[in-house]
Every structure is written in structure tokens, then in C-alpha cells.
A protein has these predicted regions:
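Active-site substrate-recognition segment that forms the wall
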Residues: 119-127, 216-218, 230-270, 274-370, ...
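Glycine-rich FAD pyrophosphate-binding loop
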Residues: 51-74
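Helical element adjacent to the flavin cofactor pocket in flavoenzyme catalytic cores
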Residues: 142, 149-154, 176-234, 239
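Helix-rich C-terminal "cap"/substrate-channel and partner-interaction subdomain
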Residues: 319, 337-340, 357-362, 368, ...
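Glycine-rich Rossmann-fold phosphate-binding loop(s) that bind the pyrophosphate
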Residues: 38-44, 64
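Extreme N-terminal leader/targeting segments of oxidoreductases
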Residues: 1-34, 52-58, 453-459
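Internal hydrophobic alpha-helix adjacent to the cofactor/substrate pocket in enzyme cavities
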Residues: 51, 387-407
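Dinucleotide-binding Rossmann-like beta1-alpha1 core, especially the glycine-rich loop
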Residues: 82-166
Length: 461
């Protein structure tokens, strides 16, 4: 068993071969063309596409822990077309046409990830089964109906986003209290850690070098400083996501927000024959407090949710990965949706931080004059968006003129979060809004308009 197998279900189910040998840290000063800080999806996809564009590039990836240590190895395994910001927010900053172009690029991204994992023989349990949002009350169904109508107003059709009847939804997923649902084909279930580790092996085969156990202490134009040496590079890519606040001057750039997960033991075939999810569509329901799940390739439920506290000073610590209270609530939500799981064992409990910018906007940036580049701020929607950001970074850095470099997240800069204690008070107070909205809907059967308005205002929707 690998020493980090206890990080998550995904890490624990990798074989010794999939883990591979430990990579050494940086041992000396180094000169390269591109230095990438962070060996999660953002950094690895950037390295992959840079070397696709120009195989002669000298690319070094610096990782504080090991490949896939952060959210890239611990997430819910949704390779989706979801963006943290709404189409209206994108259109307001740019135009409706650019909002549609951005969302369409995300649709294409799911297929692009599937293409790469097939071409590079990355075994990550990729199943392009779509995403199902189950409405379990009339108010949830009405919200889904309005959302689908809104998307169709941008020119998308039932081929992209479709409202489902009760029977159609139950045929796909036999959760409790189903009244309808919504479906999009633009999502695939994956094994996150296998994707990260397989992608790392691929970029190494293409010529990149990955240095693990090499924390970066300072990023400057054309220079990255670590305690193990300095890397000089024409281009420096910051791909540090939730760990960004640990860098000098970046404390208020994003807020690390924790998302926690559980996994059941493998469930019997008779259970799945009754429950569905036969094509492994990712799923959630229409509540405001986010939950998310998938049927894994080995027939478990991997199920997660938000609700954990934000920690003072944007701190990230191993003990924050576990919360008896939140893990208990997640288990309760899963049993409420699928009571037939009965007393099935919960074999894994874990968590990790995602990066939330102040305006909920993800970004891609590149300044040719300084050689500094970055991408991130995915707020938990990073499995797909990291691929798009990796392609976009590669195009920007190599000067390749494509439609991607014109997408409205390129060059976007979010304002900084408020200083403490305002940040601590505000973010944790926000957590009560979806809880209150869900309770109001359960009691009254009507939406909590004022809570919804505040939530949308706070996250820029």
C-alpha cells in the first residue's frame, strides 16, 4: 500500500504500478523554457499541450507533494461542461455570443478529454454517460424547468440540455421522491487519481520532467525559487489552485473552500439493477446545498457535498479533510436518496479544498512581457475546465492563434477577497443560505426568493 493511499477512495484503489516510483525533488538550479508550479490537472494539461505544440520545449513541473495530491486526485470524478460562473455573468462581461462560445468550448472539452485518454492509453474509468439532475420536489422541478428554458434562450437545444419526465428520470436513476429531472450528455465519470497519474506519465514520456516534494516559496518573472534550488524559465505557469494563498502576496487571491466525500463498499448487482445509473451518469438533486455523486467502475457510490467550514486565514491542513459532522450529513443525504443501500459500509471518508475567487470566475492569464502565466479558480468545476485552460495556456504561450485565446476568461482578473475577519465571517455566513433555502422549500413548497437573490448576488450570477 502506498503511503498516501489514505488520501481518498481514488488513491486507495490505485495499484502499485499506477502509483509508479516516487519522483525525486529538485536537487540543483535549473534552466528550462517553461516552469510549471503545481502537478495537478492544470499544470499537467498545460505541459501536455505545450509539448504537443512544440516537442522541443524544455518543461519542468514543480510539485510540493506528489502528482494528484490536491483536488485533482480527490474530486468527485465529474468531467463536466459546468462553469462556476453563469452564462449571464459571462455575457455581461463580454457578449451573449462569447458566452455561447465559451459554453460550447466546454461541451467540446468533455470529448477532448475522452480523446486524449484513449489516444494515450490512460486507464481512468472514463464513462461518457452524461449528467443527471434529479428533481425531488415540485419547486426543484420548476427551478430546473426555468434553467433549461434559460439555456435554450442562448440557443442550446434538447440535444444539450433536456427536461425529463418523472418516468424518464426514474429509468435513469431510481432515487426517492422523483418528480422529474434534467439531463445533459456533456459529462463523463472518471477515476480522478488515475487520470492525474496517467497524465503525468504521459507528459514525462513526451519529455517533461516532474519534480515532486519541491515546495515553491516564491514566483517571480522568469524565476521560481524553492528551498532545493532555483528554476529559471522564459515562462512560469502558476497552477496552484486552492494552495495559491500560501504564496507570498497571494493570501487573498482565492478562498480555499472544503468539499468532503464518502464512498460505500461495492454494492451488489441486484442493487444496481433496481437503482439504475447503468451508463454511470454523474448525478445530484435540485437542493441548494450542493451534493454530487457517481457510480464508480467498481460499483460503489462516491458521494460528496459542501457545508464544511472555511478556515481562518485561508489555511489548508490535513485535519480539515475530515469532519464527523459533515461526513455524517453526506451519508444521511445519500441514504435519503437511496434508502436501499441500507447498512452498506462507508469504506472511505475524505475531503479537500477547492479555490473560490471573490467573483466566482475562473481565469487564464499570460503576460508575455514578464513571462508569467496562471490558470485556476474553478470552484470545484475543474476536471473539465483544466483541460480547456491547459489548451488555452499552450496556445497563448506558443503564440498560436485559435478561438480559445479569445474566450472571455482570458485575461480576467478577480478582485481580492476581503481581509480577515470579514472573509471568515462572510464565507461561513454564506453556508447558512443554502441550508435555509432548502429548509424553507421543504416546509412551504415554495422557493426562498430572498435567499436565492443573496446567493446569486454574492457569487456574481
Amino acid at each position: 500500500m502506498h503511503e498516501l493511499s489514505n488520501l481518498s477512495l481514488w488513491h486507495s484503489t490505485m495499484t502499485t504500478e499506477e502509483w509508479g516510483p516516487s519522483r525525486p525533488g529538485l536537487g540543483t538550479d535549473l534552466d528550462v523554457d517553461v516552469a510549471i508550479v503545481g502537478a495537478g490537472y492544470t499544470g499537467l494539461w498545460a505541459a501536455y499541450y505545450l509539448l504537443q505544440r512544440d516537442p522541443t520545449l524544455r518543461v519542468a513541473v514543480l510539485e510540493a507533494q506528489v502528482v494528484g495530491f490536491g483536488a485533482s486526485g480527490r474530486n468527485g470524478g465529474w468531467c463536466s461542461a459546468l462553469l462556476p460562473m453563469s452564462l449571464d455573468a459571462i455575457a455581461k462581461q463580454s457578449s451573449r455570443a462569447e458566452a455561447v462560445a465559451f459554453q460550447t468550448a466546454m461541451h467540446d472539452t468533455v470529448g477532448e478529454v475522452g480523446r486524449v485518454v484513449a489516444a494515450e492509453a490512460i486507464q481512468c474509468d472514463f464513462a461518457h454517460g452524461g449528467y443527471l439532475n434529479v428533481a425531488r420536489s415540485e419547486v426543484q422541478l420548476q427551478r430546473e424547468r426555468e434553467h433549461i428554458e434559460h439555456l435554450h434562450g442562448y440557443g442550446f437545444t434538447d440535444e444539450d440540455y433536456r427536461l425529463l419526465s418523472r418516468d424518464e428520470t426514474l429509468e435513469r436513476c431510481a432515487a426517492t421522491d422523483v418528480v422529474g429531472g434534467a439531463f445533459t450528455p456533456h459529462c463523463a465519470a472518471i477515476h480522478p487519481a488515475r487520470l492525474a497519474r496517467g497524465l503525468a506519465r504521459t507528459v514525462e514520456r513526451l519529455g517533461a520532467t516532474i519534480y515532486e516534494h519541491t515546495p515553491v516559496v516564491e514566483i517571480r518573472p522568469r524565476s521560481v525559487r524553492t528551498h532545493l534550488g532555483t528554476v529559471r524559465a522564459e515562462v512560469v505557469v502558476r497552477a496552484t489552485e486552492a494552495f495559491t494563498p500560501s504564496l507570498p502576496g497571494m493570501r487573498r487571491s482565492v478562498a480555499p473552500v472544503y468539499s468532503l466525500m464518502i464512498a460505500t463498499e461495492p454494492l451488489p448487482k441486484a442493487f444496481w439493477a433496481q437503482t439504475g445509473l447503468h451508463e454511470r451518469a454523474t448525478f445530484n438533486d435540485g437542493r441548494h446545498m450542493i451534493v454530487y455523486g457517481q457510480r464508480t467502475a467498481d460499483d460503489r457510490f462516491a458521494f460528496g457535498g459542501r457545508g464544511a467550514w472555511y478556515h481562518w486565514g485561508s489555511r489548508i491542513k490535513p485535519q480539515y479533510d475530515h469532519s464527523e459532522r459533515v461526513h455524517g450529513l453526506i451519508h444521511e443525504a445519500l441514504r435519503e436518496m437511496f434508502p436501499a443501500i441500507g447498512d452498506a459500509a462507508i469504506t472511505h471518508r475524505w475531503g479537500g479544498a477547492v479555490a473560490a475567487p471573490r467573483d466566482w470566475w475562473c481565469h487564464v492569464q499570460y503576460d508575455k512581457a514578464s513571462g508569467l502565466a496562471s490558470a485556476g479558480g474553478y470552484v470545484g468545476d475543474g476536471v473539465g475546465t483544466t483541460n480547456l485552460s491547459g489548451r488555452t495556456l499552450a496556445d497563448l504561450i506558443t503564440g498560436t492563434a485559435t478561438d480559445l485565446v479569445a474566450l472571455p476568461w482570458v485575461g480576467h482578473r478577480s478582485r481580492r477577497w476581503e481581509p480577515e475577519p470579514l472573509r471568515f465571517i462572510g464565507i461561513n455566513a454564506m453556508a447558512f443560505l443554502p441550508i435555509g433555502a432548502d429548509r424553507h422549500e421543504a416546509r412551504h413548497g415554495t422557493p426562498s426568493k430572498w435567499r436565492e437573490a443573496i446567493m446569486n448576488q454574492l457569487i456574481g450570477h
